[in-house]
Amino acid sequence: MSNNIDVVEIYTDGACSGNPGPGGWAAVLLYKGTKKEISGFEENTTNNRMELKAVIEGLKALKRPCKVNLYSDSSYVINAFKEGWLEKWQKNNWLKSDKTPVENQDLWKELLEISKNHQVNWIKVKGHADNEYNNLCDRLATEQIKRNTRQNPKE
């Protein structure tokens, strides 16, 4: 890849009300002083699925191959790349070391496919701390849950 490759910062977060339950995801993309916020909702999901969905949608929002600094407070997402879990899972036909199937294979496979287009640096951030963009993602994700469940209270 050339030296002229764009560098983009992507912050992501997922949230779930109950696990499983209604969930929201969000990503904030930063590029040359421009900020783009994206978020979405799923009716019945898990926190880990929302964390993965946030990363997938953040990367999908890129229009061309980029160098990406991707920030997440999800150990599940970051460790899968940093600790080599994904390579092991693929080598073992998507089975964990205890021989049970890896959860969320559909999203992991989608994430692997889309991340091939980019040079991704996976960065763990502390959740609910003082990181402006991680906190923004958290607010956007939880707002999706509130907005989409307000009409259908379960109580």
From Swiss-Prot:
Mg(2+) 2 binds at residues 13, 138. The keyword Hydrolase applies. Residues 4-146 form the RNase H type-1 domain. Keywords: Cytoplasm, Endonuclease, Hydrolase, Magnesium, Metal-binding, Nuclease. Its cofactor is Mg(2+). Pfam families: RNase_H (PF00075). It is found in: Cytoplasm. Mg(2+) 1 binds at residues 13, 51, 73. One of its GO terms (biological process) is DNA replication, removal of RNA primer. Its EC number is 3.1.26.4. GO terms for molecular function: magnesium ion binding; nucleic acid binding; RNA-DNA hybrid ribonuclease activity. It catalyses: Endonucleolytic cleavage to 5'-phosphomonoester. Gene3D superfamilies: Ribonuclease H-like superfamily/Ribonuclease H. Binds 1 Mg(2+) ion per subunit. May bind a second metal ion at a regulatory site, or after substrate binding. Monomer. Endonuclease that specifically degrades the RNA of RNA-DNA hybrids. Belongs to the RNase H family. This is Ribonuclease H. It comes from Thermoanaerobacter pseudethanolicus (strain ATCC 33223 / 39E). The gene is rnhA.
